[in-house]
Amino acid sequence: MKPRNIAIACGVAGVAVGLAAAAGIVYRKQIKSAASLKRLTDYADDYDLYGIDIAYDYDLDRIIAAGVRDDQAYIDAVVAQVLPGVPAHVQAPQFACSAFVAVDAEGRVRTGRNYDFKDDTSALLVRDHPRGGYASIGFAALNNLGDNTPLDSVAGRAAALMGPFAQLDGVNECGVSIAVLTLDSKPCDQDTQRPVINTSLAIRLVLDRAATTQEAVDLLSAYDMHAMAGRDYHFFINDAAGDARVVEWDPRDPDRAFKATPVTQVTNFYACYGDEVLPNQKNGELGHGKERAAAIADVLDAHTGAQDEAVAWKALRAAAQEPNPEDITSNTQWSVVFDNTEPAAAITLRRHWGDIDAFAL
C-alpha cells in the first residue's frame, strides 16, 4: 500500500475576500485558516479527504462556561467564538467504530481506528496548534459540518472552520490519541453539579490538554457528561506508553458513574461489562460489535510483540464494514493508524486499502 500525496489548493485571495464579505468584517486568523483548506483526494463520488490548518485562537473554558447541556447551546457557543456574526450550519456529530492499540518489536505504539457510519461523508483533516495547548492532528466528518464539498462555497469554507469542535478522533504532540465510538444505551446526561462537557468537547479537551492517558482520565472525570445527538458514547484513549483505556459512563448506575477500563481493543459495547457481551447480536444497553473486536484480537494476537503498521492495517481491514442502510454502525467511512510514539496519522477513505495518505503532525 503506497501512500499518496494529492493536494488541490483553493485560492487564498478568493477565500479571504469571500469570508470577509460573508462576515462583514475581516477575521485575520479565521481567514488564514480558511485559506489553508485543501482537497487532498479526488474520488469520483465526490466524498473526499480535505485538510485545514487552524490558525485562530479559542477558549475552551469559555465554551464550557457558556453551558453545553444541549447540542444547540454547544454549537452556538462555538460559533460565537469562531465566527461571531456569521451564519454557519453545523449538526451534532454522530459516531460509530472500532479501535485498538498495537505495539511493534521496537516498542513503537500505534492506535488503529475505523470510523463507521451508514451515510457516506467527506473527511476533514484538522491540524490544530492551540494557544497554551498541545498541537494535534485528527479527523472530522464533513457531513456533520453541513457540506461535503466545502471548497464550493463560502458557507462550506466557513463551516470547515468548525472542524476542531467536531472531531471524531486525533493524536496530539505528546502521543495521546482519542477516538469516540457509539453505544446502544440511553444518552448520558449527568447532573452532579460539576461543569458540563459534551462528546465533542471531551475530544478537544483531551487533545489540547492531556500528555498521558492518565491525565486524560483525570481531566474527563472532573466533568459531568452530556452525550450528543441523542446517542450514547465511549472513548478509546491511548498514549505513547501504550496505556490504552476505554472511558465510559456506567449505564447501570443511576448517576452514570465514570469508568476507565484497560483494554487493547473495543467496538460498540461497554468495556466495563465486556464479559457479559456476546458476539453477532445486540446485547441491550451493553452494546454490540464484539465479533469485530474478536476479529481485531485474532490479528493482533497472531503478531504479539511485532504489531507493526502493516499489522495495524490488517486488523482494520478485519473489522471494516460494508454499507448497510439499516445499521447506523455499518459502512466504514475511514480507517486511520495514529502513531503515538512519533505523532502522525495515515488514513484511507471507505475501504480504499490501496490508497493511504500519510500526514505528519
Predicted feature residues:
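Secretory/export targeting leaders with adjacent low-complexity proregions
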Residues: E215-R231, F235
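A recognition module on extended beta-rich or small alphabeta surfaces enriched in W/G with H and D/E
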Residues: G133-N143, A271-A293
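Extended amphipathic alpha-helical segments with heptad-repeat/coiled-coil character used for oligomerization
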Residues: G230-N280
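Non-transmembrane alpha-helical segments in soluble domains
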Residues: R204-L207, V217-L220, A297
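Long, charge-rich alpha-helical interaction segments
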Residues: K282-A312
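N-terminal mature-domain region immediately after signal-peptide cleavage
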Residues: K2-A210, M225, A306-L361
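General structural feature for long, well-ordered alpha-helical segments within catalytic domains
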Residues: T212-E215, L219, R292, A312
